[in-house]
């Protein structure tokens, strides 16, 4: 069993990192082999919007995203962690998410479980940011079992109660994996899938990899 934590903070040892460590520690205690990836330490180019990944199934860029995609694919559990920057995830996390586009169009990460960790400085709605990352996980095919929100302005300020919430998230992910928990699609999920399939049907000549994926599954 493997678990990977994706840290979207530019700070390697900040509050989001501490909370992610707490969640990963709980997964490790449950028998998972864990790994944490600090996005800012990796070379990840912006998505250029060329569409090659949708047409041919593979990105034309060669950078550290190859390694990160492999880690996610090989993991049974995935946690996304980000501080709130201007009401949303950091630029680093958004760049990572943008480069994961093929998994949103072709959700091949089914059978995995995950969740989100958000740290904020008291401004905004961190639950909405966590909800966004969990919706991203769900779009990839991963079952999001929850999230943990913490408060911190100064690095290391996040408190014991918030660290406990992160640990509980790790425990919840481990339990979901063990029980093979299934999540029924919501009305929003079904509507998003309907919109995606309409897009792919209309532009199948540009999204050949997507078209063939869904055709094989009998949706087109």
From Swiss-Prot:
Cofactor: FMN; [4Fe-4S] cluster
Highest taxon of source: Archaea
Record-linked InterPro entries: Flavoprotein-like_sf, FMN_Rdtase-like_dom, ISF_SsuE-like
Cofactor note: Binds 1 FMN per subunit. Binds 1 [4Fe-4S] cluster.
Binding site for [4Fe-4S] cluster: 47, 50, 53, 59
Keyword Transit peptide assigned: no
Keyword entries, A-Z: 4Fe-4S, Flavoprotein, FMN, Iron, Iron-sulfur, Metal-binding
GO MF term set: 4 iron, 4 sulfur cluster binding; metal ion binding; oxidoreductase activity
Protein name, per record: Iron-sulfur flavoprotein AF_1436
Upper lineage: Archaea, Methanobacteriati, Methanobacteriota, Archaeoglobi, Archaeoglobales
């Amino acid at each position: 069993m493997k678990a990977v934590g994706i840290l979207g903070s530019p700070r390697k040892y900040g509050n989001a990192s501490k909370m992610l460590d707490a969640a990963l520690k709980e997964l490790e205690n449950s028998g998972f082999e864990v790994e944490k990836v600090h996005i800012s330490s990796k070379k990840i180019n912006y998505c250029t919007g060329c569409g090659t990944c949708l047409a041919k199934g593979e990105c034309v860029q060669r950078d550290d995203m190859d390694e990160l995609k492999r880690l996610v694919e090989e993991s049974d559990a995935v946690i996304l962690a980000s501080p709130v920057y201007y009401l949303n995830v950091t630029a680093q996390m958004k760049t990572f998410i943008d480069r994961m586009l093929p998994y949103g169009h072709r959700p091949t990460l089914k059978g995995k479980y995950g969740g989100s960790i958000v740290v904020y400085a008291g401004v905004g709605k961190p639950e909405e940011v966590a909800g966004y990352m969990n919706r991203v996980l769900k779009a990839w095919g991963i079952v999001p079992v929850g999230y943990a929100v913490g408060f911190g302005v100064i690095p290391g300020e996040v408190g014991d109660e918030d660290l406990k919430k992160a640990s509980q998230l790790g425990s919840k992910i481990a339990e979901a994996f063990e029980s093979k928990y299934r999540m029924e699609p919501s009305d929003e999920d079904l509507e998003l899938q309907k919109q995606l399939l309409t897009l792919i049907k209309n532009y199948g000549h540009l999204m050949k990899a997507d078209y063939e994926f869904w055709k094989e599954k009998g949706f087109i």
